[in-house]
Structures are given as structure tokens and as C-alpha cells.
């Protein structure tokens, strides 16, 4: 499939066996939306359908795409469907079903008071134990680093919130596939796809772009176990410096990822420089592409709109209608 060209789209919903994770029954849908982002439960769906069972079920939403004799069958979302809302029109009963992501069971259970993730243990072991409460398959790269410091659960921490704290500590990411597989991987700066007006034009002309340098730091404190360092920008040549802005704007890092032979002071200076750039946020609609999820990096080459470089996807909304139109928010790397 050439996703930058037009295709016809149809959709259906499968009931999923929570044990085998395979499709069983099938239900027709008439529309809806799928929401994706980087935080919380990360995914949700609102599905319009007819005669949906009045019970909690695992479901999977599929896109059937056809283009000039080619066809593709793409799972868009797998999650837990709640009890449907009913809309009666004479003898016809239509439903709107709200669906949670496969992470919901891990968000519903509080950790015991006093629970902690111990330092020195491989992060993948703890993450897998915390996610075992879900029915979804879990895929974690074997090279997950160990925790440098213990992470003690707060009184309102759930299995999921602790997983997210561990993910932040090791600077990795969670990526939920359309099949509902929970993936835990290192963050990557490599783009999964490139968009430009000539060779791969998927983005609609209306693009909203905002720029913000207000929160750029000019003082950076790095804390790594018993080491610490502070880097400052007091240069008269720098637009972000304490001199030119007339005040200090601090940023602190407690999860330092030092390069080989890099001192904590060198790390603080490097990170200060990396953080001193204007934040660019862009919002647009585009044609559907199956390989892009929140947290992924894409390359945009739209210089007229001021978008030329690497951007990380923050959120998506997929409309289950013509062409699976995708609304997307991105920020510059």
C-alpha cells in the first residue's frame, strides 16, 4: 500500500478472547474515533455500532484498506469495551461503546503500602511483574537497564503509575500496538517516516504551528547518586542567558544518562545547551499511516510552514471514516 495516496476504508470490530488474545466473534461498526497519546492509559476509543452485547469485553478494531487492487488489513486498537449506551429509534437499537486501553487493569490496582522497586534490579523484571495483571502480551527488550536508585511507591501509586515512574527513570517508552501488545523499548531519535510536499505528501495544507522559548532554562542542575553539578548560561551573546533575560530559570535532572567518560559537570553543560531551544508544536491532519504511534520520531520537511527537522509525535486522533483521517500533534526534538 502507498499510504500517501488515496484508499477506500472500511472497519469492523472483533471480540477478543482475553486468554488466547485471538479474535472470536465479529461485530459491525458504523463509526467512531481512536485516541492515542503518551501518558496515562495511552489509548481509548469511542465506537458506534449496532446491538453490542451488554457486558465488558475485549475488542479489536480493524481497518480494511483497498487501493488499485491492493489491500491491507490493519489492527488499529485493542482494549476493553464498557457497557454500551443505547439509542433507540423505533425498533433499531444503536450503541456507543467507550473502550479503555489494555493498560486499564494495571491502573485499577493500588500497590501495597511500603512497596518499592529496589535499586540494582533489572527494570524489565519489575515492569513485567507489574504488568502481569493485564491480559495483554508484554514485549520488553532484554537490554533494559537496572534501576540506579530505589523507587518507593506513594500511597496512591498503582501498578501502572509505578511502571511509568520506572520507564521515566530509565528513559525508555511504552508503545501499544494495534494488536494490544504492550511494548517497552528504548527511546529512539531515528525517524520512522519522513513527510514532505514532493515525495511523501500526507499532510493537509492547514497546519497550526506555535513556538515557545519562554521556559528554556539558563541554569541546569544534574544530580546522579552522590554527584552533582550546576551549569549556567551567563553569556551576553545568548538570548536565553541570565544576563539577557534578567532572571534565572532552573531545570533539574535526577536521572542522568552520562556518556562514556563524561563527567557530571560536562553532562550538565551539554544538557543545558540541548534544552536551550525554542519549543515548536505543530498540529495538523494527515492521511493514515500504520507505522506511526505517539512517542515515535518523524521527519517533517515543510520549510514554508517552518517545519524542517525531527519531531516527536505527542498525540493522535484517528477518525473511523473516510481515509482514516489522522489528527496529530508533534513537538520538535
Language-model segment annotations:
Residues 1-28:
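Polar/acidic, low-complexity leader/linker segments enriched in S/T/G and N/D
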Residues 67-99, 175-176, 298-329:
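Short beta-strand and beta-hairpin "edge-sheet" elements
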Residues 22-59, 105-106, 110, 117-121, ...:
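Extracellular/virion structural assembly segments
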Residues 51-137:
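Surface-exposed cap/loop segments at beta↔alpha junctions
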Residues 38, 47, 99, 112-139, ...:
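Amphipathic, non-transmembrane alpha-helical segments in extracytoplasmic/periplasmic proteins
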Residues 1-10, 164, 168, 178, ...:
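Acidic, small/polar-enriched beta strand-loop surface segments
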Residues 2, 76, 89-106, 142-216:
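Short beta-strand-centered interaction patches in the first periplasmic/extracellular domains
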Residues 33-52, 92-105, 222, 254, ...:
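Oligomerization/assembly interface segments of phage tail-like spikes and tubes
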Amino acid at each position: 500500500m502507498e499510504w500517501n495516496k488515496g484508499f477506500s476504508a472500511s472497519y469492523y470490530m472483533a471480540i477478543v478472547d482475553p486468554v488466547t488474545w485471538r479474535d472470536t466473534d465479529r461485530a459491525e461498526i458504523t463509526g467512531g474515533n481512536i485516541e492515542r497519546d503518551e501518558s496515562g492509559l495511552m489509548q481509548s476509543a469511542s465506537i458506534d455500532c449496532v446491538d453490542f452485547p451488554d457486558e465488558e469485553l475485549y475488542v479489536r478494531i480493524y481497518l480494511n484498506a483497498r487501493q488499485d487492487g491492493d489491500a491491507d488489513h490493519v489492527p488499529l486498537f485493542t482494549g476493553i469495551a464498557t457497557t454500551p449506551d443505547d439509542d433507540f429509534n423505533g425498533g433499531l437499537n444503536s450503541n456507543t461503546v467507550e473502550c479503555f486501553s489494555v493498560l486499564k487493569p494495571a491502573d485499577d490496582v493500588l500497590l501495597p503500602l511500603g512497596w518499592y522497586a529496589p535499586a540494582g534490579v533489572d527494570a524489565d523484571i519489575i515492569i513485567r511483574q507489574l504488568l502481569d495483571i493485564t491480559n495483554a502480551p508484554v514485549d520488553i527488550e532484554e537490554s533494559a537497564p537496572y534501576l540506579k536508585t530505589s523507587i518507593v511507591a506513594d500511597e496512591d501509586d498503582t501498578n501502572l503509575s509505578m511502571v511509568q515512574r520506572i520507564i521515566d527513570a530509565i528513559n525508555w517508552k511504552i508503545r501499544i500496538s494495534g494488536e494490544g501488545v504492550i511494548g517497552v523499548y528504548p527511546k529512539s531519535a531515528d525517524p520512522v517516516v519522513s513527510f514532505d510536499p514532493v515525495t511523501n505528501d500526507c499532510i493537509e495544507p492547514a497546519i497550526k504551528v506555535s513556538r515557545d522559548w519562554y521556559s528554556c532554562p539558563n541554569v541546569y542542575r544534574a544530580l546522579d547518586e552522590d554527584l552533582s553539578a550546576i551549569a549556567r548560561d551567563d553569556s551576553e551573546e545568548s538570548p536565553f542567558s541570565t544576563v539577557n533575560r534578567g532572571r534565572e530559570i532552573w531545570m533539574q535532572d535526577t536521572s542522568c544518562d552520562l556518556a562514556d567518560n563524561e563527567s557530571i559537570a560536562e553532562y550538565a553543560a551539554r544538557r543545558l545547551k540541548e534544552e536551550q531551544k525554542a519549543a515548536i508544536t505543530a498540529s495538523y491532519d494527515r492521511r493514515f499511516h500504520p507505522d506511526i504511534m505517539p512517542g515515535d520520531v518523524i521527519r517533517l520537511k515543510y520549510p514554508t510552514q517552518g517545519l524542517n527537522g525531527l519531531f516527536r509525535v505527542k498525540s493522535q486522533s484517528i477518525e473511523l471514516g473516510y481515509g482514516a483521517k489522522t489528527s496529530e500533534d508533534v513537538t520538535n526534538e
